[in-house]
A protein has these predicted regions:
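Function-dense linear segments that define catalytic or interfacial modules
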Residues: 172, 178-184
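Long, basic N-terminal domains or extensions that often function
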Residues: 1-168, 176
Length: 184
């Protein structure tokens, strides 16, 4: 060409199956997660933010086979509620969503956040409270609950002698509470 010589090479791309790529991505992803506090489950050596008992992994209605620590992937999920453990074999994402919904688990984190915010707005409006919302705490709570419920509780007024900043910090950091304020 008038811009000079060009060189090129024709190569055949290595074929990789989507399921193999997914397994690689999943293992890299869960292996790279780090937690401020980790724990073990039973006598296993795997450290994790919460005890891991199961890895549910399916693609195109088939199990994605891999191991992580002492666990092997499967098409079964475990739900524990009210001291009852439920096991269910799942073959599709739709079936997974239905099973979780039947067990009052909200899969969509945006939906969990909307539920929390809506309840807060209702409480604030009905009691004429104002909020001092902590977005970081909201994000944390949204990600540690399966189905959020918002409760309004009072505490002993003697604690109001403690500086407000200490009360708020304690409620948020140690108990994951969201403080609301009246107009006094």
């Amino acid at each position: 060409t008038d811009k000079g010589k060009f060189y090129f090479i024709k190569t055949k791309s290595k074929e990789i199956l989507a399921k193999d790529l997914l397994v690689k991505i999943i293992l890299n992803s869960i292996g790279s997660l780090s937690w401020r506090k980790s724990m073990k489950w039973a006598d296993k050596s795997l450290l994790w933010g919460r005890p891991l008992r199961n890895i549910f992994a399916i693609f195109n209605k088939k199990i994605l086979l891999f191991s992580f620590g002492h666990l092997k992937s499967s098409n079964s999920i475990i739900v524990e509620q009210d001291l009852i453990t439920k096991y269910k074999k799942i073959i599709s994402f739709k079936e997974y969503q239905i099973f979780l919904k039947k067990n009052n688990i909200i899969l969509d984190q945006d939906e969990r956040e909307r539920k929390i915010l809506k309840k807060f707005q209702l409480i604030c409006k009905s009691k004429n409270y104002r909020e001092n919302f902590n977005k970081q705490l909201l994000e944390e709570v949204v990600n540690i609950v399966e189905n959020p419920h918002v409760l309004l509780v009072d505490f002993n007024k003697d604690y109001l002698q403690i500086p407000q900043e200490i009360i708020i910090s304690t409620l948020q950091r140690h108990q994951r509470y969201f403080p609301l304020f009246d107009n006094k």
